[in-house]
Design a protein with these regions (language model features):
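N-terminal regions immediately upstream of nucleotidyltransferase
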Residues: 1-83, 89-97, 109-126
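Terminal (often C-terminal) interaction modules
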Residues: 3-40, 285-325
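Catalytic cores of NTP-dependent nucleotidyl/adenyl transfer enzymes across multiple folds
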Residues: 59, 63, 124-283, 316, ...
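Long, contiguous hydrophobic alpha-helical segments, chiefly transmembrane helices and signal peptides
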Residues: 62, 85-88, 100-104, 249-254
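Amphipathic alpha-helical interaction surfaces
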Residues: 71, 75, 106, 238, ...
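A short acidic/basic microdomain associated with nuclease active sites
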Residues: 79-90, 146-151, 158
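Residue-level recognition of the N-termini of beta-strands and the immediately preceding loop/turn
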Residues: 79-81, 155-157, 250, 288-291
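Histidine-centered divalent-metal-coordination microenvironment in nucleic-acid enzymes
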Residues: 87-107, 158-173
């Protein structure tokens, strides 16, 4: 796929109603752009933040779903907390129609990292209560969004279409009170456990700490980290290879890059990013040591090193096209 085609796809993702690039266009001498000029424009546009209105709509639709659940879940015996997680709160999303994750955090119990802090023991069944919460969410969504598509995955309930302008991923969970949350009294240290309805297991993570650390990384790199993540996600999206790396793991992979490798000069940042990915795939032992920002797992637990190699190939091809390596 050439950069004229990639630019068109990128534009349609960012502003689907705005058609600037056409594959059918007959280029005149004035219109003609060289491949390197198109590659430069591709990088510039890929790193840009999406229009604010796009993000606002994602939250508006998330709040619509949240309000229905908030009003009706008490009828089923639940008064949960609601929070957002994922690439939209991190501001690393690349699609105008980005979906948004809505956490529905049960009020029946909390998991405490340090059992010595438990004062009133919970006598119910966490798995049963979370199963009931999930079932209630599904019922409420079906009743309120009769023409929407509802897809039930093991960890989330995806609702889209109908009157909704965005896909909303409803994620049942419970609070996980870490020792750091108690010691430092900072909300972002409070974690969650996401419920898997198939295995009945609960999986710990710290989405608010992740958002905080992404903010910090971007600040420490003078605002270059988020644009680089957007570029990497865009390269994955437009790749002719099927790159099996989640948005979360792309963030994590680049989070592990040393801050000294980020430069105001985008070309230098691309050079060092390409070099970083090359060294990563050449050193499997080093790759095995890389962890996600919140420290809950190694990247390699979910991402095969060959997928990282595919991402490296995209950066290498782009850097070569730009004539910087």
């Amino acid at each position: 796929m050439n950069y004229s085609q990639k630019l068109k796809r990128l534009q349609e993702r960012q502003q689907p109603d705005y058609k600037q690039y056409s594959l059918d266009k007959a280029f005149s001498a004035e219109d003609y752009k060289s491949e390197i000029e198109e590659a430069q424009e591709y990088v510039t546009r890929a790193m840009e933040e999406l229009p604010a209105r796009s993000t606002e709509i994602s939250y508006e639709e998330g709040n619509r779903v949240k309000q229905h659940l908030k009003e009706e879940l008490p009828n089923y015996g639940f008064n949960p907390d609601f929070e957002y997680q994922g690439s939209v709160p991190c501001n690393t999303h690349i699609k105008f129609h980005s979906d948004i994750d809505l956490l529905v955090i049960i009020d029946k119990f909390e998991t405490v990292e340090n059992a010595a802090r438990i004062r009133n023991r919970y006598t119910g069944d966490p798995k049963e209560d979370l199963t009931r919460l999930r079932a209630a969410c599904i019922k409420i969504l079906k009743e309120n969004y009769t023409v929407a598509d509802i897809e039930k995955n093991s960890k989330s309930i995806k609702i889209s279409g109908g009157s909704l302008r965005r896909q909303i991923d409803v994620v049942p969970a419970n609070w996980y009170n870490s020792e750091n949350w108690y010691n430092y009294n900072l909300d972002y240290y409070r974690g969650i456990q996401i419920f898997d309805s198939k295995t009945k297991e609960r999986y710990k993570n710290f989405p608010f700490l992740n958002i905080h650390l992404i903010d910090e990384k971007d600040r420490q790199t003078c605002g270059l980290y988020r644009p680089l993540v957007r570029l990497a996600k865009t390269l994955k999206e437009d790749s002719e290879s099927n790159i099996n790396i989640s948005s979360y793991d792309i963030q994590a992979l680049l989070y592990n890059m040393d801050n000294s490798n980020f430069f105001q000069n985008v070309k230098d940042t691309l050079i060092y990013t390409t070099d970083y990915l090359y060294k990563t795939v050449q050193n499997p032992y080093k790759y095995q040591s890389l962890v996600v920002p919140d420290g809950t797992r190694r990247i390699a637990e979910k991402v095969d090193i060959n997928e990282v190699k595919k991402l490296f190939n995209e950066f290498y091809t782009l850097s070569n096209e730009l004539g910087i390596i």
